[in-house]
């Protein structure tokens, strides 16, 4: 809130000026002095223009997580924003790029933001820059700001929004923190600031509307969220949802009217002193908005006029259709009319300014002006609140070739959600006559034109007219193409973004539930191993969070080479059950089974064998495949022998078991994908010695020759990448399905429906634990899927043009939503997750059967059988079952489709029958193996271990399992 810090000291600070490490940094024409703010993606510093000795704000945007294409798109957007010159919008002055940051030089606003202004309302009378304002317009004893100040800020905010509407732009993140304040122009004349802000124009700090003696409002942070990764909808949801429109909170498509809701919330906070709806997360916020039913109540002590309250209520309508339109908002008496309650001094100044503006408008109306095509026209008079025209060098986003990269195939941002409202009509964009008007004009022209010889001047005029028509046609075609691209772009990417946000939002809601928190606290008393902590950063390195913003922003080019040995105990200490005699033996055995089967798929090696590699092993050291998700007691009934009669379960417990079953299947698929992934991003020799190291592959290192020198050929990298990608996508679908079932269960709980009389009070807590695990795993898989996609694209570019797997060749299919990214992702024909999983399960069951016959590693055989069953259950799992809930979803995953010839997830009816028979045969083998192990354990005096050499003597060998052959799909 303090005005300026540097004027009290020197404009340049020496190295030994008390701040130790704090030093001035010269950035071209500017000097960065000290930090004045910090956000999610950037740090704001106060700076000085070296030549003019005026203040600027330098915003350092961290670009370490951006690949080169995203950097180029950001630069293009910045160049466009330089043309948005308006007194009530913080101007982008300059841009300077370093190796790790892009420094955005912007106008400096000395009074901070509006949220700080409201919070410090009681101390404004003591500040030298606001003392006179409070003396004239004191704030009410209770509530927010004086209504004169509120209306003054509203007029300036409306002026900026009206300017943005002429450009078909929406801000999408209006909130008090993004509304910056500058002292009135009289402050500089009085010399209260020794260093004045840098001006991009003479009228940069001259208000268009409002009272000249009051602070000047400017909209900040406009447009940058559209270009930065993992922003837009996702960042806003995670950042400050208090000012978001309900249609955004409902994940619906929204238009420019979302800004009007934000204006209503900001206006309410200025009047009352707090936001109209307050909640801990956006789920509770939406619930409060819906429960309010558009009944906006003001505290009794609020000093606000009825017109102002009416305007706020008309803006805070849940339904965008019922919400006040922009036209009515700009024409409302509160925005357009005079401000009541002005003191005589300001009232006289207001009248003088209105007279000057009226005289200026009259002179301007008397002069003709030229349109963009060279014709003369008369401009209508503009009101005092109308925005000033942009400078002649302003680059229109709608017609700039650079902007056409947004939403096109050249834009590589996978996670962006296109939410900017654009119009295909070019009339409002360019100010030129529309195509229909030109046709009418051309049709009427020959009627009034007298025949005669064509003069050179007339020929030039005709040429200009034809060129203008051609230019209009080109602009219209460009706009249509761009609109189509944006529609396709939003349709393709909003699914991934929305799903990631929904998963994290539901996990947040469940973790914040008081009933679950109380149960978890009760569990911590008798047991040291408590529940999973909300937002536990188990999916990546400790410095990264698992929020949707971080997960999506780093998914573009970040992957994590981390062993999971050390993380197994920390992640799953909520569960008691683990397969095998110890956690390490189970994971070791199943890892061995996965590794042995990795080179024998389909008769050829889809996972590259050692012959394809220059060095290294497959898979690398440090991989623990299973079980990363241990089940609770009693959940082995699905894979058991069926002879053990289970007690009847209540509905809550059934839902819990179904959720855990699907989550376990997803973990098996994840473990299979990890075998591929670990070969794409192997551990370095120094990291293999210490399995606790979790290296992070930065986006800039991914494309370097050193990072790609993994000992794999290009063909091997291509095969591994596409196999890992389809497996990760399958794991994501299973994780989403388990979350959908949990969400349906939770919704019925909140509606008060009696689902079941569960004798186990910990069922809800266990569901919460599963949901938190699924959330963390979902974010991790999303990151690794994006890394696999980038590796696949890189391998495609390195393949020869005539190679069968080159992107230009035919016979390829896409991989769902991921394939519609700007860098087209294509998967080789015949490569599906279901086929990979089927062959892997088949290979594992065969290997386990051989080991069982020879008496080798019987506990490992048991785990291999169970893993194969889980993987085949995942093959039978249908994406169409996602809408099912409760027991129906679990049954759908374990039964064959009734449609004999119908195709589900690429599997024909006969193929599903083969898979079901294979599951049944493996279950029989598992039952026999369990009986054998139980008998051996009973006969031995040492229950810990039985020598493999004595195994055949203790139990006669079982018959070889009947394993059906894979069908040609």
From Swiss-Prot:
- Entry's Pfam families? ATG1-like_MIT1 (PF12063), ATG1-like_MIT2 (PF21127), Pkinase (PF00069)
Q: Name one GO molecular function term.
A: protein serine kinase activity
What SUPFAM superfamilies does the record tag this protein with? Protein kinase-like (PK-like) (SSF56112)
Name of the protein: Serine/threonine-protein kinase ATG1
Q: Which reaction does it catalyse?
A: L-seryl-[protein] + ATP = O-phospho-L-seryl-[protein] + ADP + H(+); L-threonyl-[protein] + ATP = O-phospho-L-threonyl-[protein] + ADP + H(+)
Family annotation (PANTHER family): NON-SPECIFIC SERINE_THREONINE PROTEIN KINASE, SERINE/THREONINE-PROTEIN KINASE UNC-51-RELATED
Q: Where in the cell is it found?
A: Cytoplasm; Preautophagosomal structure membrane
Q: Spell out the Low complexity composition-biased ranges.
A: 960-969
Q: How does it sit in the membrane?
A: Peripheral membrane protein
The taxonomy runs: Eukaryota, Fungi, Dikarya, Ascomycota, Pezizomycotina
Keywords of the record, alphabetical order, are: ATP-binding, Autophagy, Cytoplasm, Kinase, Membrane, Nucleotide-binding, Protein transport, Serine/threonine-protein kinase, Transferase, Transport
Q: How does it assemble?
A: Homodimer. Forms a ternary complex with ATG13 and ATG17.
**GO annotation (BP), single:** autophagosome assembly
Provide the Protein kinase domain boundaries.
Answer: 30-335
Q: Which InterPro entries match?
A: Atg1-like, ATG1-like_MIT2, Atg1-like_tMIT, Kinase-like_dom_sf, Prot_kinase_dom, Protein_kinase_ATP_BS, Ser/Thr_kinase_AS
List, as start-end ranges, the regions of compositional bias called Basic and acidic residues: 14-23, 351-380, 434-443, 457-471, 881-890
Give the main EC class.
transferase
Q: Where is this region: Disordered?
A: 1-23, 351-471, 563-587, 880-907, 941-969
Tell me what organism the protein belongs to: Coccidioides immitis (strain RS) (Valley fever fungus)
Q: What is the similarity comment for this entry?
A: Belongs to the protein kinase superfamily. Ser/Thr protein kinase family. APG1/unc-51/ULK1 subfamily.
Q: What's the stated role of this polypeptide?
A: Serine/threonine protein kinase involved in the cytoplasm to vacuole transport (Cvt) and found to be essential in autophagy, where it is required for the formation of autophagosomes. Involved in the clearance of protein aggregates which cannot be efficiently cleared by the proteasome. Required for selective autophagic degradation of the nucleus (nucleophagy) as well as for mitophagy which contributes to regulate mitochondrial quantity and quality by eliminating the mitochondria to a basal level to fulfill cellular energy requirements and preventing excess ROS production.
Q: Which GO terms describe its cellular component?
A: autophagosome; cytosol; phagophore assembly site membrane
Asked if the record carries the keyword Ion transport, the reply is no
